């Protein structure tokens, strides 16, 4: 564990803190209907995704979510796997403060929740079976440090799952990032290059694979047609922009 972050990581944490402290729908104490309805749609996507990793999750006794925000995804995992010890982490304390909302919604109780960035998690070495994040790894900035920290806390053979991440081939990466940042100019978004992520994972001590997932869930009309086309021509997923999951297993 380290408390010395890359300057870009520190900047990212400041931006995220500003969001969680001030957003009218998600700041501490807001308990807004808009937030519950929005996350409810995300929850349906997440529930379908974790079904694809049921083997890894069912075998895990100690599960940690990184960059989990208010923890609704952790609560779903706890509800489906009640015997597992589920820990929620996020870099921003005011994000973690909202996890009680989702414990009520999903009728569960998380075992642990504390503020920690993905690059510095205050847990002992080799004590976790599975680390996951949902649509968050592309915000990590320093992916090497996040992977190194995941490896540190994982047991040999443990899993690190980066789920529902935007990806693109190196060839189209610049265009893909420009597109997503036109959609949300207020928050700079990154697009992951699978070959780069897998190379970083190998260097950190993982064996990894990427699973492309051209789902049409929660897409606009044009995006739905695009992802439907990718589902018919899966070979294009490794070239064109596509959502994907990274399944990384720590070497024994």
Where are these regions (language model features)?
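A conserved beta-strand element that flanks and buttresses the S-adenosyl-L-methionine
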Residues: 132
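Acceptor-substrate binding/catalytic loop of class I
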Residues: 180-195
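A C-terminal cap/extension of S-adenosyl-L-methionine-dependent methyltransferases
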Residues: 5, 28-31, 106, 175-180, ...
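A short glycine-rich, Lys/Arg-flanked "PGG" loop and its adjoining helix->strand segment in the class I
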Residues: 144-156
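Conserved class I S-adenosyl-L-methionine
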Residues: 1-57, 59-69, 159-183
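Class I SAM-dependent methyltransferase SAM/SAH-binding core
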Residues: 69-120
């Amino acid at each position: 564990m380290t408390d010395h972050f890359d300057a870009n990581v520190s900047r990212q944490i400041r931006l995220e803190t500003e969001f969680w402290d001030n957003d009218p729908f998600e700041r501490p104490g807001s308990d807004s209907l808009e937030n519950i309805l929005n996350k409810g749609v995300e929850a349906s996507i997440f529930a379908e995704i974790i079904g694809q990793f049921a083997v890894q999750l069912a075998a895990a006794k100690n599960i940690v979510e990184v960059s989990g925000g208010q923890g609704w995804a952790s609560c779903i995992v706890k509800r489906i796997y009640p015997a597992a010890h589920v820990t929620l982490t996020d870099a921003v304390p005011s994000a973690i403060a909202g996890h009680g909302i989702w414990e009520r919604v999903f009728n569960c109780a998380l075992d642990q929740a504390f503020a920690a960035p993905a690059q510095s998690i205050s847990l002992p070495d080799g004590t976790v079976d599975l680390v996951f994040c949902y649509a968050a790894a592309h915000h990590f900035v320093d992916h090497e440090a996040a992977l190194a920290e995941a490896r540190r806390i994982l047991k040999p053979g443990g899993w690190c799952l980066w789920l529902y991440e935007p990806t693109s081939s190196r060839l189209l990466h610049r265009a893909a990032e420009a597109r997503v940042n036109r959609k949300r100019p207020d928050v700079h978004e990154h697009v992951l290059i699978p070959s780069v992520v897998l190379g970083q994972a190998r260097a950190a001590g993982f064996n990894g694979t990427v699973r492309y997932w051209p789902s049409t869930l929660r897409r606009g009309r044009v995006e739905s047609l695009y992802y439907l086309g990718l589902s018919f021509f899966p070979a294009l997923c490794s070239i064109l922009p596509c959502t994907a999951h990274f399944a990384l297993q720590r070497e024994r």
